[in-house]
C-alpha cells in the first residue's frame, strides 16, 4: 500500500472513532421552561410528577397536571406553598395506603 492510502485509512478511522461519542439527539434538557410559585389546591390535581435532577437538567422539577383541561404546570420546588402541597399530597397518600 502506498502512503496516501494508509493516510486516508487512518483519517477515516480517526473520524469514525470521534463520531462514536457524539449524542444523536440534542433535545435532552429540562422539561420546565418557567416555574410557578402559586399555590395549587390538592383536590384539583390529577397527577403530580417529581423529576429529580440529572445530568441533563440540574434542578428538581415538579409538574402538576390539573383535573380540568389536563393543563400542566411547572411548580417551584423551593416555594413554601409548593412544599406544603407536597406534604399534603404525601399525607393523603399515606392515609390511603394500608
Swiss-Prot record:
GO terms for cellular component: external side of plasma membrane; extracellular region; extracellular space. CDD domains: Chemokine_CXC (cd00273). It comes from the Eukaryota. One of its GO terms (molecular function) is cAMP-dependent protein kinase regulator activity. Belongs to the intercrine alpha (chemokine CxC) family. Disulfide bonds join 30-57, 32-74. Its main location: secreted. Pfam families: IL8. Residues 1-21 form the signal peptide. Several proteases can mediate post-secretion cleavages. DPP4 cleaves CXCL10 on its N-terminal 2 amino acids leading to an antagonist form of CXCL10. This dominant negative form is capable of binding CXCR3 but does not induce signaling. MMP9 cleaves 9 amino acids instead. Mainly secreted by monocytes, endothelial cells as well as fibroblasts. Expressed by epithelial cells in thymus. Microglial cells produce CXCL10 in response to viral stimulation. Keywords: Chemotaxis, Citrullination, Cytokine, Disulfide bond, Inflammatory response, Secreted, Signal. Induction: By IFNG/IFN-gamma. A diverse population of cell types rapidly increases transcription of mRNA encoding this protein. This suggests that gamma-induced protein may be a key mediator of the IFNG/IFN-gamma response. GO terms for biological process: adenylate cyclase-activating G protein-coupled receptor signaling pathway; antiviral innate immune response; blood circulation; cell surface receptor signaling pathway; cell-cell signaling; cellular response to heat; cellular response to interleukin-17; cellular response to lipopolysaccharide. Pro-inflammatory cytokine that is involved in a wide variety of processes such as chemotaxis, differentiation, and activation of peripheral immune cells, regulation of cell growth, apoptosis and modulation of angiostatic effects. Plays thereby an important role during viral infections by stimulating the activation and migration of immune cells to the infected sites. Monomer, dimer, and tetramer. Interacts with CXCR3 (via N-terminus). It is found in: Secreted. This is C-X-C motif chemokine 10. Gene3D superfamilies: 2.40.50.40. The modification Citrulline is found at residue 26. InterPro entries: Chemokine_b/g/d, Chemokine_CXC, Chemokine_CXC_CS, Chemokine_IL8-like_dom, CXC_Chemokine_domain, Interleukin_8-like_sf.
Amino acid at each position: 500500500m502506498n502512503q496516501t492510502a494508509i493516510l486516508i485509512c487512518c483519517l477515516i478511522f480517526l473520524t469514525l472513532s470521534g463520531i462514536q461519542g457524539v449524542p444523536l439527539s440534542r433535545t435532552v434538557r429540562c422539561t420546565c421552561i418557567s416555574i410557578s410559585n402559586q399555590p395549587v389546591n390538592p383536590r384539583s390535581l390529577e397527577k403530580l410528577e417529581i423529576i429529580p435532577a440529572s445530568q441533563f437538567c440540574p434542578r428538581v422539577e415538579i409538574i402538576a397536571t390539573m383535573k380540568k383541561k389536563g393543563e400542566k404546570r411547572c411548580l417551584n420546588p423551593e416555594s413554601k406553598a409548593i412544599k406544603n402541597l407536597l406534604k399534603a399530597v404525601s399525607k393523603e397518600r399515606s392515609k390511603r395506603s394500608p
